[in-house]
Amino acid sequence: MGHDSFCYLIVLRCALRCGIIALMQICALQKKERRSKMESSDRSSQAKAFDETKTGVKGLVASGIKEIPAMFHTPPDTLTSLKQTAPPSQQLTIPTVDLKGGSMDLISRRSVVEKIGDAAERWGFFQVVNHGISVEVMERMKEGIRRFHEQDPEVKKRFYSRDHTRDVLYYSNIDLHTCNKAANWRDTLACYMAPDPPKLQDLPAVCGEIMMEYSKQLMTLGEFLFELLSEALGLNPNHLKDMGCAKSHIMFGQYYPPCPQPDLTLGISKHTDFSFITILLQDNIGGLQVIHDQCWVDVSPVPGALVINIGDLLQLISNDKFISAEHRVIANGSSEPRISMPCFVSTFMKPNPRIYGPIKELLSEQNPAKYRDLTITEFSNTFRSQTISHPALHHFRI
């Protein structure tokens, strides 16, 4: 055999080998695509059957299940990140600020403003005590949410809906049918409360009165917090209020039933909030975690405290001075349900036509605008979109 023929055979053999490898890769890819389509179809069927019960995750637990449905299974890489928490030696915890000094003399108020500003810049999260809402009101609010979710399912079903334009609705996983990601282990009561609150008779009977009372007190607290946050930005105390940041809020009553396999799912997946700020009332079970220095840090319940976190819209108008930190809730592995009530202070549900962008007084040659101007409608449409793979705020960066 001549040298040329030998070389030809070698080249032919290599080509055949490459062809076989390529064919194997194509077959593997096609198999993966078929499996993905089957899994997607299975998930859709599961989601449809789950949704039609109108009893949420609470209904699954009440049925006595020992294993969670596959549609709740969180991807392995996300589950691995559950272990990426701060080591005990660091003893990281979000700041706690006593608001009592904020309404006293100038020196005390300045100290409170500095603490809030530092927490908003470094953490995006902090807890507040002496905030003006009594423990009695907070306990009644938590009990009201518990009673709603644990009442007769036939009564709850009257509020069940996926129409987020309604003022009052109950659901489990609002995006259940709009994306293929794993469902979360929780149920939600959502109520639009300000500036045009629903009529008392339109709210659930078991918690309507306390929701109205709690909402009014939250409005007062929210306005006070925006004064302190304005001052922390070096602005007039009324600046953020004059921008309409405090005018609107929606309250969620979150119910996290005990999960038989808490290591396989989440209570809420990693996300940022769409609000200017969020005011959270939580019970003593815990489960909320926030990203800080690339570690997950537990937001441990503090008796009588409320958790405050900066939302995307405040990060935008502060031009990244304050941060909207990613956070999540791990699945409830305790024997009791976890109750929490976030109040999103934002015009997200009923947007106004106002244009929002980085506050001009905060900009300079050294600190140019990092975001383009936008309307709340534009932001909310992006926030709800399932086509983006990163926080909605990134979409508006210049």
Curated annotation (Swiss-Prot):
Record's keyword terms, sorted: Iron, Metal-binding, Oxidoreductase
Top-level taxon of the source organism: Eukaryota
Task: Read off the Pfam families from this record.
Answer: 2OG-FeII_Oxy, DIOX_N
Q: In which tissues is it expressed?
A: Expressed in etiolated seedlings, leaves, stems and flowers.
This enzyme's EC code(s)? 1.14.-.-
Q: Which GO terms describe its molecular function?
A: dioxygenase activity; metal ion binding
Annotated residues for binding of 2-oxoglutarate:
R338
Recite the UniProt cofactor note for this protein: Binds 1 Fe(2+) ion per subunit.
Q: Which PROSITE patterns does this entry report, sorted A to Z?
A: FE2OG_OXY (PS51471)
EC main class here is oxidoreductase
Q: Which SUPFAM superfamilies is this protein grouped with?
A: Clavaminate synthase-like
Q: Which residues form the Fe2OG dioxygenase domain?
A: 247-347
Q: GO annotations under biological process?
A: biosynthetic process
Tell me which cofactor or cofactors this protein depends on.
Answer: Fe(2+)
Which InterPro entries does this entry report, sorted A to Z?
DIOX_N, IPNS-like_FE2OG_OXY, IPNS-like_sf, Oxoglu/Fe-dep_dioxygenase_dom
* Chain residues that bind Fe cation: H271, D273, H327
Tell me the protein family, please: Belongs to the iron/ascorbate-dependent oxidoreductase family.
PANTHER family for the chain? 1-AMINOCYCLOPROPANE-1-CARBOXYLATE OXIDASE HOMOLOG 4-RELATED, OXIDOREDUCTASE, 2OG-FE II OXYGENASE FAMILY PROTEIN
Listed name of the protein: 1-aminocyclopropane-1-carboxylate oxidase homolog 5
Q: Which gene encodes it?
A: 2A6
